[in-house]
Amino acid sequence: FSIQMDRFSFSETRYLNRMIDYEYFKDYKSRVQMLFVQENNPLSVYKNLENNGYLSITDEHSFTYTIIVSDFSGNERIVRIPIEGETYASIKPKDIKTTPYFVDADEATAFEEKGIDVYIPSNALYEDTYLNIKFVGDSIHFHEDNTPIHKNITIGFDVEKYSPEDRKKLYIARLYGYYKNPSYVSTYKKGARFTTKTRTFGIYTLVEDTIAPEIKALNFSNEKWISNNTTLRLKIEDKGSGIKNYHATVNGKYILTEYNYKKGTLTHSFEDGVVTETENKLQVIVTDNVGNSTTFESTFFRKN
């Protein structure tokens, strides 16, 4: 068969998970392309398919498997792999670890235990799968993240045991890395039920955040002249649920600020022309994803 990567539909993008060895990609951060077409892979890039690329090898045959790769400029590389058929006394079948949490890929499936529930719509997984799931306290250890998910899966938490005030500061997080640090995931709150939608397996849990964001001036100080500055720069940070929004004004007028997510900085350019007074009162309000808020105020002077 052949693969022609000139173009493919945006709606097909997620199916690229079936074109590569996804488990290898997640474990080693390197993409290995499959030279056969797995089930539930409707990508339109495949041409001249014969037996979906699968080979029938017997002990009576030897042949050469040829791979030809070319780029858009016509450069070409050829790899030839000799294959010799060989008879084995027995072939050990692949071990399939069974669990109580079986998902038929063609059917919607739901699990619920200890106040946590999971809904998996039909065709969310690419193939029938036994999931490894553990419900521990306010956490769900939800399979392994080297298994791809095609459609959003919903995870729900019953938070009835928490007071309405405590619920305001709770959010759903995914734990990541060696130290299992919490990372905020979009949390939908309705009464005593919190839900999130995800296309990544992993550990999900409830986390409390009562600490407000931090704001610090970077290139100016309170009640100082900054006539030579071309910008106002501030550092904003939230170590809990993460920053949801920010708002900055000078003398009560809204000013445009650019947020650099990687550096955690807010920058306003004086070229915008909003700051026209000599004495200026800056106010910056930063709010995190559970409503904790910090207000930063400073006065600066500037010749115009």
Say what each PLM segment does:
Residues V207-S241:
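N-terminal non-catalytic regions of secreted/periplasmic and cell-surface proteins
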Residues I153, K168, F201-I215, E279-T287:
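Extended Gly/Ser/Thr-rich low-complexity repeat segments
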Residues F1-Y88, G191-T196, E237-N304:
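Long, low-complexity serine/threonine/glycine- and acidic-rich segments characteristic of extracellular
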Residues Y101, T109, T210-E214:
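Proline-centered linker/hinge motifs at extracellular inter-domain junctions
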Residues E113, N123-E127, F135, S163-R167, ...:
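Short proline/glycine-enriched turn/loop motifs at strand-loop junctions of beta-rich domains
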Residues N146-Y204, N245-H247, K253-L256:
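Proteolytic-maturation and junctional protease-sensitive modules
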Residues S90-D95, V103-D104, E127-Y171, N222-N228:
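Proteolytic processing hotspots in large secreted/extracellular or virion-associated proteins
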